[in-house]
């Protein structure tokens, strides 16, 4: 089974992500060792919490460059929730620079009379990259689970893989470009749809492993 490094940088419970990856047919390895990131077949960067502590913890553990190197090498990479946001250059939530792997900013939802912030609960994805490997074997407009007050705004619209609409605001819910994929929602909390998305990622990892 492919070994997937789940990056541990003290930002949230990793247990449910690991359980999801196991169900999808992978062997998760929770780690903050740059060497183990290099040896793994793929990397998952999960995370819940605030932007500034997240990037501070990553940098304190010396993980910024190993993550950038892994992505540049073509290793399959999946960011989840905060693990999507910190790939960007900056966030309205904090003052720390993000990893800057993706050009663009993290913005806060504008208040509207009939919406709650954080955006919390189930919402429907609208696919903007219909052929992305993440969406294989999914129904159209699938429901997935969100908990967030901020969303990513990439400069290049072509990397946007899906959007959601909250009130009158349509925002990026997932990005995908070559081996780099990341989602704002929680696949590990999104029932069978989420498991299929994780399985699609694991299938791509398996394809890249030399026979």
UniProtKB/Swiss-Prot annotation:
Keywords: Amino-acid biosynthesis, Cytoplasm, Glutamine amidotransferase, Histidine biosynthesis, Hydrolase, Lyase. InterPro entries: Class_I_gatase-like, GATASE, Imidazole-glycPsynth_HisH. Pathway: Amino-acid biosynthesis; L-histidine biosynthesis; L-histidine from 5-phospho-alpha-D-ribose 1-diphosphate: step 5/9. It comes from the Bacteria. GO terms for biological process: L-histidine biosynthetic process. It catalyses: 5-[(5-phospho-1-deoxy-D-ribulos-1-ylimino)methylamino]-1-(5-phospho-beta-D-ribosyl)imidazole-4-carboxamide + L-glutamine = D-erythro-1-(imidazol-4-yl)glycerol 3-phosphate + 5-amino-1-(5-phospho-beta-D-ribosyl)imidazole-4-carboxamide + L-glutamate + H(+); L-glutamine + H2O = L-glutamate + NH4(+). One of its GO terms (cellular component) is cytoplasm. PANTHER family: IMIDAZOLE GLYCEROL PHOSPHATE SYNTHASE SUBUNIT HISH. This is Imidazole glycerol phosphate synthase subunit HisH. It comes from Nostoc punctiforme (strain ATCC 29133 / PCC 73102). The lineage of its organism: Bacteria, Bacillati, Cyanobacteriota, Cyanophyceae, Nostocales.
């Amino acid at each position: 089974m492919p070994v997937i490094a789940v990056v541990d940088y003290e930002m949230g419970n990793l247990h449910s992500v690991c359980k999801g990856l196991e169900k999808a047919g992978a062997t998760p390895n929770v780690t903050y060792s740059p060497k183990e990131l290099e040896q793994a077949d793929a990397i998952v960067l999960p995370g819940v919490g605030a932007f500034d502590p997240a990037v501070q913890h990553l940098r304190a553990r010396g993980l910024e460059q190993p993550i950038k190197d892994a992505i540049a090498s073509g290793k399959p990479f999946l960011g989840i929730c905060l693990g999507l946001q910190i790939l960007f250059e900056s966030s309205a939530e904090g003052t720390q620079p993000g990893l800057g792997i993706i050009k663009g900013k993290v913005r806060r939802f504008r208040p509207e009379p009939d919406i709650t912030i954080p955006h919390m609960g189930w919402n429907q994805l609208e696919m903007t990259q219909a052929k992305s490997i993440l969406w294989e074997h999914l129904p159209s407009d699938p429901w997935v689970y969100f908990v967030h007050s901020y969303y990513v705004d990439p400069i290049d619209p072509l990397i946007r893989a899906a959007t959601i609409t909250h009130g009158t605001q349509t925002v990026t819910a997932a990005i995908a470009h070559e081996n780099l994929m990341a989602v704002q929602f929680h696949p590990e909390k999104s029932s069978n749809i989420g498991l299929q998305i994780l399985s699609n990622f694991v299938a791509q990892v398996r394809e890249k492993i030399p026979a």
